[in-house]
Amino acid sequence: MRVILTACFLLVFNLTEYSYGKTQQHIFDVYILGLKLGRLNYAVEYKNNSYSAAGNLRSTGLFSAIAKYSFEASSQGKIERGVFKPKYYYERSDTGRRKEQKILRYFDHGIELETKKTAKPYWQDPNQQMDALDPMSAIIFILRDQTETNVCKQNFAMFDGIRRVEIRFVDGEETTEGHLRCKGIYTRVGGYSAKELKDGTNFPFYVNYQIENDDYRVISFQMTTNPRAR
């Protein structure tokens, strides 16, 4: 998940949630500095040892009249011993000023990147990123329900075809509301220009879970970023 928003970026779980068999749909409202920016909507289907997911982030309300933004992504892969193994990733984004589209195809020997952008020397080699999740898989991995044994302990890498980041949870504490608040660090590893790196390398984030029996369900995700970070 790229850092695509500024200042205080907050995802708040919307109570609208659907489940059709093994297909689950989740909706989060997106806020910046207390103002509703848009909505993240994604669905995941688990079948045997495979998963498929699709989601979109769109600006809504007053913000959409000022700066329209849309991000769509889909991913398919396998689950091996609880670990996501992507096989295909598609992404399309429109910031109002720039449109982008990319596809990642995963093979035994490496990853094939399809994009119209001209490669830069600092881009990460896709064939060296087989251990990393694609952005859509990363969204699922962060926002899915957790158990007591693995909550606040997630640690993985993400690769979007150009950039590699590490997402690491470092600790957690119970809040006065009886929720669990986990702290994590989003670290830029490679694929960024020198100018981009001046905006920062490490970005803290927080995930709040509601505890239901032995399940921990995300109710909010918060990240504070530099105004130009991504």
Residue ranges and their predicted role:
Residues 12-18:
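C-terminal segment of classical bacterial N-terminal signal peptides
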